[in-house]
Amino acid sequence: MISKAGSRTYERAHFPSRHPRLSTMERCLLKWAVIDRDDRVLDVGLGNGLMAEYLLRNMECEVCGVADDMELVRSTRGLVRSADLVYAAAGDIPWRDQAFHAVLLRPCRLDESAMENQLREVHRVLKEGGQLVMALENLPAPLRSALDAIRETPAEVTENITRRRAMKMLSQLGFEQFSWHPCGIFAGALVAWKRNTVEERFKKGEGE
């Protein structure tokens, strides 16, 4: 029986890299992600599959992914055969509580309620002390309004959540230690950490 680590080694040896060209945003997400060998990492959205492939080949971590596009899931499975990739709605991440050390979240056009549900699910599946790296547009309001007017998006989909609003949502859910890392002029990576209540209780006990 091949172990997870063995399957990653086999994949690197028998399925040569396509020398993927990661997008600027994907490179930004990977730059600020704190990932150790054998960590479990969740890629929410999957994109074109190149970031999941990069994680598997270069970070030696266990890669999982979820997207609400079945064709995207199928195509990404062809790139990263040892990753656990599933089809599910944005607000329904089908893994147990505290399953992941890190979650990488791509920019997506969800209304505020749907985004809050998605972030709540991210918080649920992250381990205490786990990291979220979230890609966000950071457009000035006039430019954002102009782009929204010309984009072909369904009527029920509103503008992207702003950085300030995302931080407020995350804080209410139990994230802390926020940092913002620009990626180009109008986008960036928002980093947040799930509050570690066990560590807090331990420190509180030491102080008493």
What are the language-model segments listed below?
Residues 102-114:
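A short SAM/SAH-binding and catalytic strip from SAM-dependent methyltransferases
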Residues 116-128:
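A short glycine-rich, Lys/Arg-flanked "PGG" loop and its adjoining helix->strand segment in the class I
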Residues 157-173:
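Short alpha-helix
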Residues 91-103:
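A short acidic, Gly/Pro-enriched loop at the edge of an enzyme's catalytic core
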Residues 48-92:
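Class I SAM-dependent methyltransferase SAM/SAH-binding core
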Residues 173-208:
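Core SAM-dependent methyltransferase catalytic element
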Residues 1-34, 50-51, 133-155:
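Conserved class I S-adenosyl-L-methionine
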